C-alpha cells in the first residue's frame, strides 16, 4: 500500500485542478483530500458527519448547504472549493448520475478559466433508491448519456476516475433513503438495495471502459473492511477514507508516470492510523498524555534487532553428525549458454500492488479479485528487494491496454490503434 505524506501529496497535485462529483460518501473523499493537502492527520468523526458547513479546513462553501436549506430531497445542492497558491479542489454534490443539474456542471467546467486535470466521480445509491421502481433501467440509460457527454466535453488530458459504489452494511439507517410515509415509495429492503448496487456497479464499469475511462473498484477494495463502516451502514470512518485517498493518489501517479516513494509499512507514523477500526468520537489532543504522544511526521526506519529477545530461550547449536565421505568427482558436462527465465507478467513483492487485466473472474461476473488489503499492520518481514526496480500501482480496471505514446506530450485518453489484419500465408507442402 502506497502511503503518502502531506508534502508528497502537495507535489503530486501541484498546479492541478481536481473535481470530485458524488454523494455524501464522496463529500468525505473531498474532505480527506483537502485535509491531506495541508497536514498529516485524519478526519474527525464530527467532520465526517457534518454537511453543508460554511468552511472546512480553509475551504469555502460556494452554493447550497447552509447558504440555502439543509434537507434530504433530491434537489439538494452543495458546491465546495478549496483553493491555495498551487492547488484547486472542487466538490459538487450529486443525487443523480445525469440530469439537468449535471449538464449545468459540465457546462461550467467547460467554460471555466481552468480545465480540470482529474475528475473523481460516483453516483449510485440515490439513483437506485430515490427514483421509483424503474430506477435501475433509468440509471443505465443515464450512464450512457453521462459518459457520452464526458467524452465530448472533457479534454483528452483530463483523467476521469469512476469509482464503483462501496459495500453496504447489513443494517442500513441512512437518512437519505425513502421512508414509509404517505406520498413516497415504500422503503427498499437491504437485500434488494445490495443487489441493485451490484448490478449498478457492473453497468457503470462496462459503460466507463466502453468510453476508455478508468474505473477504481472500491467495492472490491473494501468488501472485507466492513468493520470500518459507520453505524448507518453506508458511510465510512476516517481510516477507510485515508485508504481510499491513497488508492486515488496512487492511481493518479501511475497515470502520470510519477514514481511514488517506497516507504516501510512498519513506520510508526502509519501504525497509529491503521491500528483502530472503531468508530468512536476521538478526544481532543489536549487530553492525550505524554505516553500517547504522536510520532514525528518524518520517522526514521526502525533498525533490525541485533540480539535475540531476552524473553525467548536461545536454542543450542545442532549436534554434528557422523562425517560423510568426500563426494566423488563427476564427469565434466558440456557447456551450454545459460537460459534466463522470463515471465509474461512482472514480479511484484508482497507489499506492492499490480495492475490486472480486464478479464472477469470465473466466480464473479465483471470483477477481478486479488488479495485483501490489511487495515492492521502485519508482522515485520525481511526486506529482500529484487535487483531490478519495480513500480507500485493500485489494483484498477483499465479501460484500454497500457499504451506508451511516441512523444512526452501526447493526450492521456488516446484510443489504441487496432492491429492490421494480414491475409493468411499460403501453406506449402513439406517434402516427404
Curated annotation (Swiss-Prot):
SUPFAM superfamilies: SGNH hydrolase (SSF52266). Residues 285-294 have a biased composition (Polar residues). Residues 273-312, 407-432 are annotated as: Disordered. InterPro entries: SGNH_hydro_sf. Residues 296-312 have a biased composition (Pro residues). Gene3D superfamilies: SGNH hydrolase. Belongs to the PC-esterase family. This is PC-esterase domain-containing protein 1B. It comes from Rattus norvegicus (Rat).
Amino acid at each position: 500500500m502506497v502511503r503518502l505524506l502531506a508534502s508528497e501529496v502537495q507535489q503530486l497535485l501541484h498546479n492541478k485542478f481536481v473535481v470530485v462529483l458524488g454523494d455524501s460518501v464522496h463529500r468525505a473523499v473531498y474532505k480527506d483530500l483537502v485535509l491531506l493537502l495541508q497536514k498529516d492527520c485524519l478526519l474527525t468523526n464530527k467532520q465526517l458527519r457534518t454537511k453543508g458547513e460554511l468552511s472546512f479546513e480553509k475551504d469555502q462553501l460556494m452554493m447550497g448547504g447552509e447558504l440555502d436549506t439543509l434537507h434530504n430531497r433530491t434537489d439538494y445542492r452543495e458546491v465546495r472549493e478549496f483553493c491555495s497558491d498551487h492547488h484547486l479542489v472542487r466538490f459538487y454534490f450529486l443525487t443523480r448520475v445525469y440530469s439537468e443539474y449535471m449538464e449545468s456542471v459540465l457546462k461550467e467546467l467547460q467554460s471555466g478559466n481552468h480545465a480540470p486535470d482529474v475528475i473523481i466521480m460516483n453516483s449510485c445509491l440515490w439513483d437506485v433508491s430515490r427514483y421509483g421502481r424503474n430506477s435501475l433501467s433509468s440509471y443505465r440509460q443515464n450512464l450512457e448519456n453521462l459518459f457520452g457527454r464526458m467524452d465530448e466535453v472533457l479534454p483528452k488530458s483530463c483523467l476521469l476516475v469512476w469509482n464503483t459504489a462501496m459495500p453496504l452494511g447489513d443494517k442500513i439507517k441512512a437518512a437519505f433513503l425513502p421512508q414509509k410515509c404517505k406520498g413516497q415509495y415504500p422503503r427498499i429492503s437491504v437485500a434488494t438495495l445490495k443487489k441493485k448496487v451490484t448490478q449498478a456497479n457492473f453497468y457503470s464499469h462496462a459503460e466507463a471502459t466502453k468510453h476508455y475511462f478508468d474505473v477504481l473498484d472500491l467495492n472490491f477494495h473494501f468488501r472485507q473492511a466492513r468493520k470500518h463502516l459507520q453505524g448507518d451502514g453506508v458511510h465510512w470512518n476516517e481510516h477507510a477514507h485515508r485508504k481510499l485517498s491513497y488508492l486515488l493518489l496512487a492511481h493518479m501517479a501511475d497515470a502520470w508516470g510519477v514514481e511514488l516513494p517506497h516507504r516501510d509499512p512498519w513506520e510508526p507514523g502509519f501504525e497509529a492510523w491503521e491500528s483502530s477500526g472503531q468508530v468512536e468520537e476521538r478526544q481532543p489532543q489536549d487530553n492525550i498524555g505524554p505516553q500517547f504522544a504522536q510520532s514525528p511526521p518524518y520517522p526514521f526506519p526502525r533498525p533490525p534487532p541485533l540480539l535475540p529477545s531476552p524473553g525467548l530461550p536461545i536454542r543450542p547449536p545442532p549436534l554434528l553428525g557422523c562425517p560423510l565421505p568426500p563426494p566423488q568427482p563427476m564427469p565434466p558436462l558440456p557447456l551450454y549458454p545459460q537460459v534466463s527465465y522470463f515471465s509474461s507478467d512482472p514480479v511484484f513483492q508482497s507489499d506492492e500492488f499490480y495492475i490486472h487485466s480486464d478479464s472477469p473472474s470465473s466466480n464473479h461476473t465483471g470483477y477481478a479479485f486479488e488479495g485483501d488489503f490489511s487495515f492492521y499492520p502485519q508482522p515485520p518481514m525481511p526486506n529482500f528487494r529484487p535487483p531490478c526496480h519495480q513500480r507500485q500501482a493500485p489494483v484498477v480496471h483499465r479501460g484500454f491496454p497500457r499504451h506508451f505514446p511516441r512523444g512526452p506530450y501526447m493526450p492521456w485518453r488516446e484510443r489504441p490503434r487496432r492491429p492490421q489484419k494480414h491475409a493468411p500465408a499460403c501453406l506449402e507442402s513439406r517434402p516427404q
